[in-house]
Amino acid sequence: MEHIGIDLGASRSAICVVSSGGEVMLERTIRTGEVERFLGKRPTSRVAIESCAESRLIAIRAREQAHDVRVVPTVFVRSLGIGTRRIKTDKRDAKNLAIASFRLGDELPHIHIRSDESAALQDLVRARSSLVSQRTMAINFVRAQLRKALLGRGPRRSAKTFCAGVRELLGEDTPLEVNAHLATIDVLNEQIEGLEKKMKVVAEASEPATRLRKITGVGPIVSLAFLAAIADPTRFASGSHLASYIGLSPGESTTGGKVRRTGIVAAGQKQLRALLVQAAHSMLNARRTREPMAEWAVELERRRGRKVAVCALARRLAIVMWAMLRDGTRYDPTMTRPRERQDPSEQLARAIAAAPGQSRCLAG
C-alpha cells in the first residue's frame, strides 16, 4: 500500500507519495481543488493529512474513493518531524506526513472525521460561542471606560439589559466610543438570540438532545454542544477517556514515588468544558430538585471547597451524558448515586457469611 502525505493550503497543496517499501515515489504541488482528482487516480492508499479547515471535506472525499484516511491533529505533527530545526515548508511537511504514515502504520495518531450533520451542528454551536465572545469583549470595553470615569464597573445586569443600564447611568453624556460599543452589543444580542432560538428548535427535534435535557442544569445549548463535541460516543473507550478529551481529568505530578494530584488539565474542548461547569453550577443551585449527584457534590464542597466540587460534578455530568448516548438510555437520577464506601471489617464479615466453609481460615 502506498502512503500519501498531503499538506493542505487555502489555494495550493503539497503532496508526497511513499511506496510500500518506504521510498519516495512522487512529490508535487497542485491546486487544493485538484486534490480530489489526484487521489482518484491513485490506487488504494493510506492518506495522511494535517488537521485544518479543508481536511474534513478532503478526508470524506478520499474515503469515498476507498482510501484509508488519517487526519493528524496539529498538536502531534511536530513530534512527527514537521517544523523541526526551524525549517518548515509545505513540501517537507507533506514528506514527513507520508514517512510517518509508513513508519507508524496503524499507530499514527489521528482524529475523528465528522459527518456532515455533526459538522453542521458544531458550526452552529461555534457560531454562538464566537458571538458571545465578541459581546463579552465589547462589554468589558464599556466597563473599562466607566471605571476610568470613576463610575465603578457599571450596572450589574445580564448581557441583554446591560446597554439599557449604561444609558441610564450616563444619560446624554455617553461618549462616542461607548455608544459605538453599546450599539454593537445590541446587534450581537439580536444575533445571539436568533441562534439560540434555532438551537432550541434543533434540540427539540433531536431525540438524543431531548433525553439529555432531562438532567437538571442541561438545556438546549449544553445538550447540543455535547452532541457536537462527542459526535460518536463509541469512539471513547471509557468515561475517563471522555473526561480527558474534555479536559476535566485531574493532573498528576509524581516524583520520587510520591503521587501528587493537581488541578484539572484544562486541555481539549474548552467551550464544552465551560458549558458543563455552568451546568454543574445550575445543578448545585437548584435546591428544590436536589439529585443524588448534587448531594454528592454538596458533601464534596464541604470538604474541598466550591471550585473542586463544581469541577468534579461537571466531570460526572459529562460521563453520565456520554453513557446515556452510548447505551441509548434515559436519565435516571437514582442510577447516578455514588457507591458508598464499605468499612473493611464489614467487607470481611460479608465474605465470611458468603462462604461459611472457609470461616475458620478467614478467622485464623
Where are the predicted features?
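Phosphate- and other anionic-substrate recognition elements at nucleic-acid/protein interfaces
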Residues: 1-171, 250-252, 285
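Conserved phosphate/pyrophosphate-binding and hydrolysis machinery centered on Walker-type P-loop NTPases
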Residues: 87, 114, 152, 156, ...
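Low-complexity, acidic/Ser/Thr- and charged residue-rich accessory regions of DNA metabolism proteins
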Residues: 257, 261, 296-364
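Phosphate-backbone recognition surface of nucleic-acid-processing proteins
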Residues: 211-214, 220-221, 225-306
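Non-catalytic, well-ordered alpha-helical scaffold segments
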Residues: 56, 74, 92-95, 118, ...
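Short helix-capping/linker segments at secondary-structure and domain boundaries
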Residues: 105-109, 138-139, 192-195, 231-235, ...
